[in-house]
């Protein structure tokens, strides 16, 4: 619904991201951006590196919530999480905040704060990865 309602405003989105895979530690920064925007993601990655997060230019994809906007041309980034125990807790009686490792949550919050702030502050107008030619 969001993508349909804001279809004309896709270009106004600097970078889309979401966290929708549990509470595991983030291990990689991935993205669907053009080459100039990748330079920004690599700079962001250098800030994220002390948190144990590597830049991964090969893998990843937009999450299910931002996917419709990415399909319409929004640049996206993914902070890929360790989902090893995701289905042990997700939508079970044990899906409660006390099951989350506080250090993993701290790392996630720091990573998203860095990503959001630095993506917003760059002078680069982030652009999506060009679509592959048939």
Role assignments for model-derived ranges:
Residues 14-19, 58, 68, 75-80, ...:
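Structural recognition of the beta-strand scaffold that forms the well-ordered cores
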Residues 2, 37-47, 62-65, 105-111, ...:
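Stable alpha-helical elements in mature extracytoplasmic
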Residues 1-40:
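Acidic/histidine-rich catalytic neighborhood of metal-dependent amide-processing enzymes
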Residues 4-8, 46-53, 71-74, 95-98, ...:
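Sec-exported extracytoplasmic/periplasmic mature domains
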Residues 50-65, 130:
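Short catalytic/ligand-gating loop segments at beta-alpha or beta-beta junctions
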Residues 26-35, 54-59, 95-105:
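Second-shell loop/turn segments in exported
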Residues 21-25, 61-62, 82-87:
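Solvent-exposed loop/turn segments at secondary-structure junctions
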Residues 86-134:
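His/Asp/Glu-rich mid-to-C-terminal helical/loop segments that flank catalytic regions of hydrolases
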